[in-house]
Amino acid sequence: MKIITLASAFALLAAGAALNGAAAQALVKADGSSTVFPVTEAMAEEFQKANKDIKVTVGIAGTGGGFKKFCRGETDISNASRPITASEQKACKEAGIEYIELPVALDALTVIVHPSNTWAGEMTVADLKKIWEPEAQGKITNWKQVRDSYPDRPITLYGPGVDSGTYDYFTAAIVGKEHSSRGDFTASEDDNVLVQGVAGDQNALGFFGLAYYEENHNKLKAVKIKLNDAAPAVEPSVENARTGKYQPLSRPIFIYVNKKAADTRPEVAKFVEFYQNPKNAVELVKEVGYVPLPEAALKAFQERFKKREIGTGFTGSKVGVSVEDLVKEKLVY
């Protein structure tokens, strides 16, 4: 009985120590865009190696879903593949959530097909609009309906869900209005589901961020984009996103930081500062397949966080806005 009692005592002591250790570990919560997820996840992994006392969790609720949590005060950081909308700004303001808008990288939103697709190596914005506009639902169901030169084959569509910032940006850039899209496509907030869908269907077409294409380029084919029939076909790439040649699907991606959390909880500020460290902001962003910010822009956004400047630089169109433009824009809260 004595041995059992001692063993029990040691077990209780060990459990208590574990609980105390867990309680001592500070927590930073991030959620939102699946496109931004690889960047924030890479940052979190490296950060936690050097900061064992801080745990960073990163969810994938989609940009819209992430902002819902953020504006309810449930998260410290919201990953976003498009800027905060007017309705989201209002929700945050009504809840007393002040936010700091920080672009973290550039992305080339990538249209993809199955590798065996020999006819749609390049497409115009008009081609894509014809496929994705609301009027196409139930009507444009065959590749030949897009262009006469395309084969008589069914077309299967894959795309992010309606809570996704990538969905918002694509519909704005291609159709001309956010959320303006046909609804008869396979939708998922998990880009890996889209990868598997297109990779397994010779007639498929889909879209998502460049990083997921780069990670799966051996089983997918990227479509070159033309602004019109006379324009050159431009492939989605780090270089073409950096130079602005890849239009209209180049875009900045963001994190939004809860100002109060950054002010009152050192672990949040420490993680954001790590995120913006020039070495990490270049090497880790490149590592996951996105385009690092220009040096001058990164410095400007470091200063924005240091000064805790709140609000958004987006009050007009979100399509075609450069990072350099964002540095100059007046913030509105």
Briefly describe each language-model feature range.
Residues 24-333:
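Flexible loop/hinge segments at secondary-structure junctions
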Residues 1-8:
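Bacterial N-terminal signal peptides that target proteins for export
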Residues 10-11, 22:
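Cleavable N-terminal signal peptides
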Residues 17-24:
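Sec/Tat signal peptide C-region and signal peptidase I cleavage site
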